[in-house]
Amino acid sequence: PEKIPQKLLEVVHIITGNGHSEEELPQQDADVFKQILSLLRIRKGTDFTYYKQTTIRRRILRRMAINKNEEPVTYLTFLRENKTEQDVLYQDLLIPVTAFFRDLKTFDNLCESVFPLIVKNKLPGEPIRIWVAGCSTGEEAYSIAICLKEYLDKTSAYTTGSLQIFATDISEPAIAKARTGIYTKSNTTGLTAQQLQEFFIKINGSYQATKSIRDMCVFAVHNFLKDPPFGKMDFISCRNVLIYMEPYLQKKALTTFHYSLNPKGFLLLGKSETTSGVPELYASVSKADKLYSRKDVQGRFFQTPTLRSEQSFSDMNTNTKTVNPKTDF
């Protein structure tokens, strides 16, 4: 609409004024927001209760404005009767922000400091296992695949094992797009001309990752906050996801990642994220890059992989490729 109703502006002012939206919102509106999140939890299985509520409510207000619902309670009624709007709101709350080689210096550090140590610790035939948690539409996973390939091609340091990059997200549309590996020209600005030429093919004005790069990455819908985690990971990247969560969920996620990592594994977070909530689990490798190593202490993770998760993981493994970096990688 051309003019957002005054009521929405008032609620936005309350939420953005000092960030304490729970205390400042009228109790009736606060209860309505909780009911909206409850609807999404029932439909999608994702609980946004411990996500940063200021961000969540801004997104809800945006959908209210688009649908010309002046009061939160009228939007709740509309939402209950409209499953499509529930799906749209859910996707809106996921806040996908990603890019190829975001923070380029971080990727340089991976090649200089992380990948050499991972390769050094590998026995002959032992796979390199990487998990990109919260991968959105795939740019981060493909960036890591390209970065790793460039490093291995340059050094010829790892020729006998398989490379397994697992990329997960709770958004089905995001995962579907990631699997295609197709991106518009504007989406590929983080790639060099050489990378674009070597690792992508042009299709109808867009660019698709080559099959060799796509085969390195296995994409799956997965919620690392509630689904059984993957294990024996050498490296986990979870960038710009934790910033949308309250400390309780951040600690839960970081504990899960500690459980998933090998004893000498690495964790990469976003520039505004930290492991300060669980200092006993991680040691800082690079403060600038928010790169951490796993401390060899017993974590607090309590969930064990189920038979279903082990089978799903096995199914994912069958899609990975054993490669020789110098030839058909």
Q: What positions do the PLM features span?
A:
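A short N-terminal interaction module
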Residues: 6-128, 234
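Extended basic-aromatic, gly/pro-enriched interface segments that bind polyanionic ligands
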Residues: 133, 154-235, 241-251
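Conserved SAM-binding loop of SAM-dependent methyltransferases across substrates and taxa
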Residues: 137-158
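Short "lid" loop at the C-terminus of a central beta-strand within the Rossmann-like core
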Residues: 171-172, 225-226, 272-276, 299-300
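Conserved class I S-adenosyl-L-methionine
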Residues: 173-175, 179, 235, 271-289
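A short glycine-rich, Lys/Arg-flanked "PGG" loop and its adjoining helix->strand segment in the class I
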Residues: 250-263
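Conserved beta-strand signature within the Rossmann-like core of class I S-adenosyl-L-methionine
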Residues: 263-271
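PAS-family sensory modules
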Residues: 296-329
